[in-house]
Amino acid sequence: MRTIVVCSGGLDSVSLAHKIAAEQQLIGLVSFDYGQRHRKELDFAARCAARLAVPHHIIDISAIGGHLSGSALTDDIEVPDGHYAEETMKATVVPNRNAIMLAIAFGLAAAQKADAVAVAVHGGDHFIYPDCRPGFIDAFQRMQNEALDGYASVRLLAPYVEVSKAAIVTDGEKHATPFAETWSCYKGGRLHCGRCGTCVERREAFHLAGIPDPTEYEDQDFWKAAVSQYSAAEVR
């Protein structure tokens, strides 16, 4: 299938891009600038597109993102430290973010005669982000079937929606994903902080997958204390 991947530049979406390139016909990556403080991730998405020799579309929706206030990812609100399973991580929710981005991606896919849009939502996101859950994926597909009826037929591929981030690391290694060429940290510093929810989840995923983590973190050991109170089953 001719497929466009929504790629933030993070571990999940870059791994997905490599998977789609190996298993489908990857025709491009689409990324979004929504005013996120960690927009350096877009550079890693661009590197992925160059590596896979496909076009890279960066859609500027920062004007919209500026109105979706109240998130630590876009506003002057401190990004909380700790495990993704903690209630404080809801501060990183950007309301309706995936619905907005996917609607644009589907429009792009229809215009380019693509067969599918692929997105890297995964099981570890379910606790915090409602627009990463299977119910949302299914409902969005039904909505797009109506929105594009008679014009285009575009599938929403979400191969990781029921699996853990550790499983994505395993799949990424299978498809030769260069993990060092991905960015996860929400704080957007020179290095991954090692303390925010996505850094902790990233470090834990490599540990659970039994695959060496090439990432350099400012705090190499914080993740151990952060995950010690949760079992893998409780957060996935």
Swiss-Prot record:
The keyword Nucleotide-binding applies. Gene3D superfamilies: HUPs. Its EC number is 6.3.4.20. Disulfide bonds: none annotated. Signal peptide: none annotated. It catalyses: 7-carboxy-7-deazaguanine + NH4(+) + ATP = 7-cyano-7-deazaguanine + ADP + phosphate + H2O + H(+). Pathway: Purine metabolism; 7-cyano-7-deazaguanine biosynthesis. GO terms for molecular function: ATP binding; ligase activity, forming carbon-nitrogen bonds; zinc ion binding. ATP binds at C7, S8, G9, G10, L11, D12, S13, V14, S15, L16, A17. Pfam families: QueC. Its cofactor is Zn(2+). Zn(2+) binds at C185, C193, C196, C199. Binds 1 zinc ion per subunit. GO terms for biological process: queuosine biosynthetic process. Catalyzes the ATP-dependent conversion of 7-carboxy-7-deazaguanine (CDG) to 7-cyano-7-deazaguanine (preQ(0)). Belongs to the QueC family. This is 7-cyano-7-deazaguanine synthase.
